[in-house]
């Protein structure tokens, strides 16, 4: 009897969650993710190249962010600065759209029937759940993006440049490495959901505390400068706490080196490069992700409020 009741209860819970989904969150998240990534993709390219720079001769040597950007521009041109942009835009748009979509549905489900706001831990868990669900769908796009970004222009061995584009990379990775190849970096990626969870928790709490401080309703809409400030602070906090996993994931997904797994990457990076190896690329990453986060959240908040306003007008 108990065994029959559990699936029924589980499906009832899921149907309750899906009752809270709103397409507005999906559309607004996609809009923010796409716009921010189109604007700042070259800095993401720099971050990836620094993250995997471990002394191999096959890789170009970069002295800093500007040197990296100018070298890529001279050798590969504008196209070089936008290597991997297609899967990045697809991945970022889909990731942000699904993240906001799942997160708001889970959050609405948890707040249904209660007057008080969620506790910090509840925000953290809700965002982690949304992140894990999103990663299950989008990980192949992130593997593809990394592979395309690591096709260096001017490389002597032409075999190092084996992908013609996003779909070619997806097909070849699946053909030669199977599903496992498309999900390389998935485990550190799951740990990476802690980044999004910490960011969303900080973002929600900062919004609530700020509105409380200036005597506004907890869910009151902020101005654009206020959204920018809150988003920037939450992003810097999350990056400082979780950056090393991004280096581990990038190295696992790199086609030039073969690692035995997450622990193999961690041990080898620590032995060869020390603690600094886990923070390679953090400067260009912070320069990129902070404004990217601000663009994403400002676009998301404004588009979602606009679309939700249209929904309310239709209902009334």
Swiss-Prot record:
Keywords: Membrane, Mitochondrion, Mitochondrion inner membrane, Repeat, Transmembrane, Transmembrane helix, Transport. The chain crosses the membrane at residues 26-46, 89-106, 123-143, 185-203, 227-243, 281-300. SUPFAM superfamilies: Mitochondrial carrier. Changing residue 249 to A/W: Significant decrease in mitochondrial folate levels associated with deficient glycine cleavage system. No effect on its mitochondrial localization. Changing residue 96 to A: Significant decrease in mitochondrial folate levels associated with deficient glycine cleavage system. It is a multi-pass membrane protein. Changing residue 129 to A: No significant effect on mitochondrial folate levels. This is Solute carrier family 25 member 32. It comes from Cricetulus griseus. The lineage of its organism: Eukaryota, Metazoa, Chordata, Craniata, Vertebrata.
């Amino acid at each position: 009897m108990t065994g029959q009741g559990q699936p029924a209860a589980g499906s009832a819970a899921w149907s309750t969650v899906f009752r809270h989904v709103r397409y507005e969150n999906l559309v607004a998240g996609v809009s923010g993710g796409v716009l921010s990534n189109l604007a700042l993709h070259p800095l993401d390219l720099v971050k990836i190249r620094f993250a995997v720079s471990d002394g191999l001769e096959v890789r170009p040597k970069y002295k800093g962010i500007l040197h990296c950007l100018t070298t890529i521009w001279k050798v590969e041109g504008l196209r070089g600065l936008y290597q991997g942009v297609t899967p990045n835009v697809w991945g970022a748009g889909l990731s942000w759209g699904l993240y906001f979509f799942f997160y708001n549905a889970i959050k609405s489900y948890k707040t249904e029937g209660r007057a008080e706001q969620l506790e910090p831990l509840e925000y953290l868990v809700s965002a982690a759940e949304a992140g894990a669900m999103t990663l299950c769908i989008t990980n192949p796009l992130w593997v593809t993006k990394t592979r395309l970004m690591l096709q260096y222009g001017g490389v002597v061995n032409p075999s190092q440049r084996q992908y013609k584009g996003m779909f070619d990379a997806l097909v070849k990775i699946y053909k030669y490495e199977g599903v496992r190849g498309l999900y390389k970096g998935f485990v550190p990626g799951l740990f990476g959901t802690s980044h999004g969870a910490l960011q969303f928790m900080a973002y929600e709490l900062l919004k609530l505390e700020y509105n409380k401080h200036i005597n506004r309703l907890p869910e009151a809409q902020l101005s654009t400068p206020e959204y920018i400030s809150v988003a920037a602070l939450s992003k810097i906090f999350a990056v400082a706490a979780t950056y090393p996993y991004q280096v581990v994931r990038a190295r696992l997904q790199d086609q030039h080196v073969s690692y035995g797994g997450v622990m193999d990457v961690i041990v080898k990076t620590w032995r060869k490069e020390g603690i600094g190896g886990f923070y390679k690329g953090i400067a260009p990453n912070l320069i990129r992700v902070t404004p990217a986060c601000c663009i994403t959240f400002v676009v998301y908040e404004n588009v979602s409020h606009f679309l939700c306003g249209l929904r309310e007008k239709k209902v009334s």
